[in-house]
Amino acid sequence: SDSSIQEVVIMSGAQLGKTEALLNVIGYHIDNDPSPILVLQPTLEMAQAFSKDRVAAGLLNSTPCLKEKVRDPRARDSGNTTLHKIFPGGAISIVGANSPSGLASRPIRVVLCDEVDRYPASAGSEGDPIQLARKRSATFWNRKIILVSTPTNKDASRIEEAFERSDQRRYY
């Protein structure tokens, strides 16, 4: 919540809680600081699975204060779908990095990029999906961009490159 920090990079081993950290950010913003949120997954299929398994079934259904703020997509006139959920003061859009239409046209304050080393080089012919997502937050003075991933190939890893550009804090 420190407005002086706009970007956070988490480079970590597999299955060590990176995605869980993103879910906590989502829950915080739904409940305490409503904002437009974009969650970027490597593919549209992974976005759908993340929304169903982690956001809806895990986060929302197991947290009463969040469940009452985000209506079930099956509810009449909820305005919610699997990949887009509205809550008072904000919304969350969950998209695939391979889908240029999901990365266009809406202002986003909180950008959450999961498993960035699995993203395609370009979202269709539109360009780098991380840069496209970053542009969505340009108008917010208090934006947050969080990149998380397990690194893949040295010197070809998006998360390694982002970590090298950061102040490289380590928490033990």
Roles of regions detected by a PLM:
Residues 1-172:
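Phosphate/NTP-binding elements of NTP-utilizing enzymes
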